[in-house]
Amino acid sequence: MPGGDAAAYASAIVTDAAGRKQYVQFLDEGVVGVDAKTGEFLWRYARTSTGPANIASPIAHDSHVYSTNARRFGGGLVQLKATADGVSAEEVYFERAVPNTLGGQILLDGYLYGTNQEGLVAVEFANGKVSWQTDGGPGSVLYADGHLYVHRESGGVALVEVGPGAFRKKGSFTPPNQPDHLHGPREMAWTYPVVANGRLYIRDLGTLWCYDIRASN
C-alpha cells in the first residue's frame, strides 16, 4: 500500500465499481480500494480520515462509496470512475451534519440513517442533504424487520420507524444494572445491537442483555 498505511478499526467491504471488483478498506490515512483479483492499489480518499481511530465501515452503492471516521468530524461520498491509469475517486460531497459517529450507518431506499452528535439523522445518500434530525445523542444502529434499533452511547435503547420524511419512536427503555463507565467519554456504550431468532441482544462492556421481541400470539 503506498505510504504504508496502518490498519484502523473499520471492516473491509466488497464492491463492483468502475469495471472492477474491489476490496474497500478505511485505513489510518483514508479509505482505499484495491483490485480484488490482483491486489493492485486503485484509489484513496483521505478527507474523512483524522486517523488512527477510523472506526465505521464504508458503505458502497453502485459506483459510490460513503465514509466517516466516526469521530464526529464529518462524512463524505465519492464516485469511482474508470480512468486510463486505473480508478479515480471523485468527491461528490463532504458534510458535517451527516451520520458521523462510530455507531455506523444504514443505507435504505436512497437514504442514510445513523447518528451524529445531536441524535438520529436521515440524509439523502446522493447529495448529503439532511431530511430530518432528532435529539437523543449518538448511538449505534441496526436495521431489522422494518425498524431501526438504536443503542445510545448513554446506554438507552430505542425502536424507531423511519422514512425519508418521517420519524416515529415506537418505544424505548434502559437496560437495568448498567455497568460503571469509569473512564468517561473513552468508555461509552458503543456496541451495536444484534437481532437473531426473535431476540434482541444488547451489550455494554462486560454486561449482556437478551430480550424476546417475538410478536405475542
Protein language model annotation of sequence segments:
Residues G19-K21, D62-S63, D109-Y111, D145-G146, ...:
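Short coil/turn segments that connect the beta-strands within blades of beta-propeller domains
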Residues G75, G155-V157, G163-P164, H183-N217:
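Blade-level signature of beta-propeller repeat domains, shared across WD40, Kelch, NHL, RCC1
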Residues Q79-N100, A122:
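Flexible internal linker/loop segments at domain or repeat junctions
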Residues M1-R20, F26, R44-H61, T68-R72, ...:
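Extracytoplasmic beta-rich repeat domains
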Residues D35-G39, L80-D85, E124-N127, E161-G165, ...:
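Short loop/turn segments that connect beta-strands within beta-propeller blades
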Residues F73-G75, R96-G165:
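Loop/turn-rich, solvent-exposed surfaces of beta-rich toroidal or solenoidal domains
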Residues D28, A70, Q117, E153, ...:
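Short loop/turn segments immediately following the C-termini of beta-strands
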